[in-house]
């Protein structure tokens, strides 16, 4: 379980950090759930990068 320190009674910031850390852990576990060939792994990586680009383009 990730450990996050709450500073200056800022619970909102601590909760945001906790969610980010726990999401990274879940993604890592999901990635190692089963074996993917190198080409498939690269395709998945490109797909995720494309989603991130779309997300940040829409924010601007």
Swiss-Prot record:
Belongs to the bacterial ribosomal protein bS21 family. This is Small ribosomal subunit protein bS21. GO terms for molecular function: structural constituent of ribosome. It comes from Mycoplasma pneumoniae (strain ATCC 29342 / M129 / Subtype 1) (Mycoplasmoides pneumoniae). Coiled coil: none annotated. Keywords: Ribonucleoprotein, Ribosomal protein. GO terms for cellular component: ribonucleoprotein complex; ribosome. The gene is rpsU. The lineage of its organism: Bacteria, Bacillati, Mycoplasmatota, Mycoplasmoidales, Mycoplasmoidaceae. GO terms for biological process: translation. The keyword Ribonucleoprotein applies.
